[in-house]
Amino acid sequence: MPSNWDTGTSTPRKCTAIKLKQEKPSTNQVEYHILLDQDKLLSWIRDKEMFLTACSPLAKGHLAYHPLLQEIGRKHGKNATQVALRWLIQQNQVATVPKASTHEKRRQNFAIFDFELDQEDLETIARLDKDQRFVDLPGMAPDWD
């Protein structure tokens, strides 16, 4: 069962249900991408043996033009969006379903399984600012934002 709620704004009933194992979501779909820190939520999700499904994994298209991601992409023969998607799927218990408006974009989104980001790439990405939210749903932002 998927979920679209975060641990910061969850109702007591939802958290109690998970604690009692009456209801266990399989995934929590939230905004997650290279420019948004979700470490607290990821830790909670992993502790509950769930998955995080990254919503807006390309930051509403902003990552396609990110110079650092373009540079890493050139190193691997990929584009910036492929680097961003690869970064997500290299993480434990993280999945993503990126939007693609054309057949070519869908093809590119699937062409991320033939390379891996190395430690240098991951360290470079880790140094980026991680406070940029692009999905603005009033009342849905977690309490820790």
Which stretches of residues belong to each language-model region?
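Beta/alpha (TIM)-barrel catalytic core signal, keyed to glycine-rich beta->alpha loops juxtaposed to Asp/Glu
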Residues: 1-145
